[in-house]
Swiss-Prot record:
Residues 345-393 are annotated as: Interaction with host PIAS4. The modification Phosphoserine is found at S192. The lineage of its organism: Viruses, Riboviria, Pararnavirae, Artverviricota, Revtraviricetes. A motif (PPXY motif) lies at residues 162-165. Residues 111-218, 434-538 are annotated as: Disordered. PROSITE patterns: ZF_CCHC. A lipid is attached at G2 (N-myristoyl glycine). The gene is gag. Pfam families: Gag_MA, Gag_p12, Gag_p30, zf-CCHC. It comes from Friend murine leukemia virus (isolate PVC-211). This is Gag polyprotein.
Length: 538
């Protein structure tokens, strides 16, 4: 109880130091988090049989590697170091990997067995091996059939100088030189498997004298590395399918970095690669920056010509890739060359270019951050991955994000203590909560309807208010007119003096009343005027 199953992925995580050491031997760097992500989430989606817990099956690893190295938008350059390291663990397994390595059956032997004559009985019992490269020479006659056809384009190399670093080996003791066999140098160090162009296939010497071994590029016996030069089609495709170094140094640098990691080129191959992909001025600039990156024993850039020439020579050096020392020189040379490409690709400092990088309407925060970092690398002398530059990159990320994301990031609590990773995570949350175009359209339509409804209600309210105010004014006016007429009547009555009971109201004399007043004219009485009333219709 309590036991957990061990998987290839968990095994690599438990021995992460060994994984990093293997990656360093391949001139690459790996990170644990991305290692887990690619193994458990990315590679299973390639539909090549990769399990979520990882595998050391070389066939499945090869299928994943083909997907990763696919040209164009279907490739995954960022996953190259990880699949290369995983392949190295499967090809040259450490002790803790060997129990998980799938034995590789001799698939090449059965198809060619019917065409071979019957083999003589062996004097010793046959021994089984996990690695076909370590099988007995008597059982490996059909191996030369795996190599490319001798009638291929390699025939043109007969007229050229021999390729670099060929180790012809010492002459045989009996003085008989055989072009098909090369005697191994005694005491030569055991070579470790490498990828692609320097393939560490261990092929036994071929005893069949009818198989041509005149080409040094096909030398594969006795643990020697096989050498394949760049094909003209590869160089042509790389040059025509990628922008120039001056136009987009980042993209071309990524291509050359991928080639350096996967093909493990020699010094001559590097010169051929630079001469094809770069102009003369660009190549000189790259070489100059690479020589500036050479470090001395104290770890600082050195100015000593001897140290610089030893680490990054301008003329063809005497480095043998069949020896550990020669391979170490080549690994260091490729690292310096990559540093020279990165430094030469930086444009003059132009902070305006960096400030001009803004987040697109539908661009994710992670993609925007990558563009922002690339602008820092290209237009400034600062490294965005440097912890000392994290504050500047964070501020640029906030200010140049989309308006809705930037406003919410500025209102975060304890903003000064937030790391760049924290800001990216918060921005991702805000970005993922954005409404879809359909939701946005529905919201705009709903807001428009609500606005129209509010406008109509406001118009009705104002109309009612105007009517109420008009009625109130008319009522006041009517009340004023009626009140004035009433006051006129009452005022006339109040102006009449008080009369005695025997006093005339007309002449004010006593002794008679107004109807009997002799001074009052006796004519027909006119009609009494009527008070006129105003109505609302008037």
């Amino acid at each position: 109880m309590g036991q957990t199953a061990t998987t290839p992925l968990s095994l690599t995580l438990d021995h992460w130091k060994d994984v990093e050491r293997t990656a360093h031997n391949q001139s690459v760097e790996v990170r644990k988090r991305r290692w887990v992500t690619f193994c458990s989430a990315e590679w299973p989606t390639f539909n090549v049989g990769w399990p979520r817990d990882g595998t050391f099956n070389p066939d499945i690893i090869t299928q994943v590697k083909i997907k990763v190295f696919s040209p164009g938008p279907h490739g995954h350059p960022d996953q190259v170091p990880y699949i290369v390291t995983w392949e190295a663990l499967a090809v040259d397994p450490p002790p803790w990997v060997k129990p998980f390595v799938h034995p590789k059956p001799p698939l090449l032997l059965p198809p060619s067995a019917p065409s071979l004559p019957p083999e003589p009985p062996l004097s010793t019992p046959p021994q089984s091996s996990l690695y076909p490269a370590l099988t007995s020479p008597l059982n490996t006659k059909p191996r030369p059939q795996v190599l490319p056809d001798s009638g291929g384009p390699l025939i043109d190399l007969l007229t050229e100088d021999p390729p670099p670093y060929r180790d012809p080996g010492p002459p045989s003791p009996d003085g008989k030189g055989d072009s098909g066999e090369v005697a191994p140098t005694e005491g030569a160090p055991d070579s470790s498997p490498m990828v692609s162009r320097l393939r560490g296939r261990r092929e036994p010497p071929v005893a069949d004298s009818t198989t041509s071994q005149a080409f040094p590029l096909r030398l594969g016996g006795n643990g020697q590395f096989q050498y394949w030069p760049f094909s003209s089609s590869d160089l042509y495709n790389w040059k025509n399918n990628n922008p120039s170094f001056s136009e987009d140094p980042g993209k071309l640098t990524a291509l050359i970095e991928s080639v350096l990691l996967t093909h493990q080129p020699t010094w001559d191959d590097c010169q051929q690669l630079l001469g094809t992909l770069l102009t003369g001025e660009e190549k000189q600039r790259v070489l100059l920056e690479a020589r500036k990156a050479v470090r001395g024993e104290d770890g600082r850039p050195t100015q000593l010509p001897n140290d610089i020439n030893d680490a990054f020579p301008l003329e063809r050096p005497d480095w043998d890739y069949n020896t550990q020392r020669g391979r170490n020189h080549l690994v260091h040379y490729r690292q310096l060359l990559l540093a020279g490409l990165q430094n030469a690709g930086r444009s003059p400092t132009n902070l305006a270019k960096v400030k001009g990088i803004t987040q697109g309407p539908n661009e994710s925060p992670s993609a925007f951050l990558e563009r922002l970092k690339e602008a820092y690398r290209r237009y400034t002398p600062y490294d965005p991955e440097d912890p000392g530059q994290e504050t500047n990159v964070s501020m640029s990320f906030i200010w140049q994000s989309a308006p809705d994301i930037g406003r919410k990031l500025e209102r975060l609590e304890d903003l000064k203590n937030k790391t760049l990773g924290d800001l990216v995570r918060e921005a991702e949350k805000i970005f993922n909560k954005r409404e879809t175009p359909e939701e946005r359209e529905e919201r705009v339509r709903r807001e428009t309807e609500e606005k129209e409804e509010r406008r109509r209600a406001e118009d009705e309210r104002r109309e009612k208010e105007r009517d109420r105010r008009r009625h109130r004014e008319m009522s006041k006016l009517l009340a004023t007119v009626v009140s004035g007429q009433r006051q006129d009547r009452q005022g006339g009555e109040r102006r009449r003096p008080q009369l005695d009971h025997d006093q005339c109201a007309y002449c004010k004399e006593k002794g008679h009343w107004a109807r009997d007043c002799p001074k009052k004219p006796r004519g027909p009485r006119g009609p009494r005027p009527q008070a006129s009333l105003l109505t609302l219709d008037d």
